[in-house]
Amino acid sequence: MGFRLSHLSLALSFVALALAGVAIYRNTYEAIIMNNGSLLQNASPHFDSLESGVASILTLNNKKRNSDMYLRQQLTPEACVFSAVRGVVDSAIDAETRMGASLIRLHFHDCFVDGCDGGILLDDINGTFTGEQNSPPNANSARGYEVIAQAKQSVIDTCPNISVSCADILAIAARDSVAKLGGQTYNVALGRSDARTANFTGALTQLPAPFDNLTVQIQKFNDKNFTLREMVALAGAHTVGFARCSTVCTSGNVNPAAQLQCNCSATLTDSDLQQLDTTPTMFDKVYYDNLNNNQGIMFSDQVLTGDATTAGFVTDYSNDVSVFLGDFAAAMIKMGDLPPSAGAQLEIRDVCSRVNPTSVASM
């Protein structure tokens, strides 16, 4: 009798477990139908039963939970690259909002010196190679190199068999920074190459400086085939970010009318920063509003209002942010197309901070 009761108890336990399993299945089944009803309705001709449809939906949902690496590998080559770079840039800006402005500036400083060739990314090598990073316009100022290195590695890891230059990655990072900070996105075409050289002197002579008067600025932008309107639009990059006090808040570099805005220590150390407009983390038109009120921080910015033509563009952008954002995006596309110097040795770098050991990818 006891033996039979034991078997009966065991049987009842199995029944209870089975019923619990049915309940769990039903709850899961109903939840899946609720969340994927349209999928199941549309898919019914392809399944032997609704249960097999649920099983297929479960498989799809499991795939959704796979890593970003897996998802990116399902994209087209260009889409994979854009996704990989954007993930790194977004994380960097989330960690430090200022990084967005730094990446935009890094792209500008790359393209304005012998074209968009990734030259600014090359590290100095003691005694054998002098790059652009320690040229006065960039020394202790240009930043974001590590973000570009991380983005390059992300592309390598998640987009196998796709060769993308460091110059391309820098262009994408700048575009994504503009969008992340509230600006207008724009198309970035791929296909740039990386230079095997850099130009220390070119960084000093070709880049606009905070003490440049309007005539000098016009000449530097004209040398790159930019119009006056495009010059004023690109200056709008100063609507985000900060600059070193030692650079912008010294005599000759600062707009005298705005000098009281400089929030710097008496020693003007490199760690002292001055915001370039009153909303330094937002890609907006406040930079132009400040110029119209004679409150631009840098001398080179405020002189844009000293000429009737350039002052008119400042007013246009101050009056309508959408006009500024559209013109800025168009000017960035044009800048991103500046070609490397004629005769430059080019490649696709494996590591952005150094040239390849042998120029297997020379172009």
From Swiss-Prot:
Residues binding Ca(2+) 1, per UniProt: D110, V113, G115, D117
Binding sites annotated in the UniProt record for heme b: H238
Compartments, record wording: Secreted
Assigned EC number: 1.11.1.7
Gene Ontology BP term (one): response to oxidative stress
Domain of life: Eukaryota
Induction profile: During wound-healing and by factors which induce suberization.
Cystine crosslinks: C80-C159, C111-C116, C166-C352, C245-C264
Record GO terms (molecular function): heme binding; lactoperoxidase activity; metal ion binding
Known glycosylation sites: N36, N126, N161, N199, N213, N225, N263
Cofactor: Ca(2+); heme b
SUPFAM superfamilies according to UniProt: Heme-dependent peroxidases (SSF48113)
Pfam families, per database record: peroxidase
Keywords (A to Z) from UniProt: Calcium, Disulfide bond, Glycoprotein, Heme, Hydrogen peroxide, Iron, Metal-binding, Oxidoreductase, Peroxidase, Secreted, Signal
Residues that, per the record, bind substrate: P208
Free-text comment on the cofactor: Binds 2 calcium ions per subunit.
A GO cellular component entry from the record: extracellular region
InterPro entries: Haem_peroxidase, Haem_peroxidase_sf, Peroxidase_pln, Peroxidases_AS, Peroxidases_heam-ligand_BS, Secretory_peroxidase
Residues that hold Ca(2+) 2 according to the record: T239, D277, T279, D284
Active-site positions on this chain: H109
Catalyzed reactions: 2 a phenolic donor + H2O2 = 2 a phenolic radical donor + 2 H2O
Residues the UniProt record annotates as site (Transition state stabilizer): R105
Function: Removal of H(2)O(2), oxidation of toxic reductants, biosynthesis and degradation of lignin, suberization, auxin catabolism, response to environmental stresses such as wounding, pathogen attack and oxidative stress. These functions might be dependent on each isozyme/isoform in each plant tissue.
Family note: Belongs to the peroxidase family. Classical plant (class III) peroxidase subfamily.
Name listed for the protein in its UniProt record: Suberization-associated anionic peroxidase
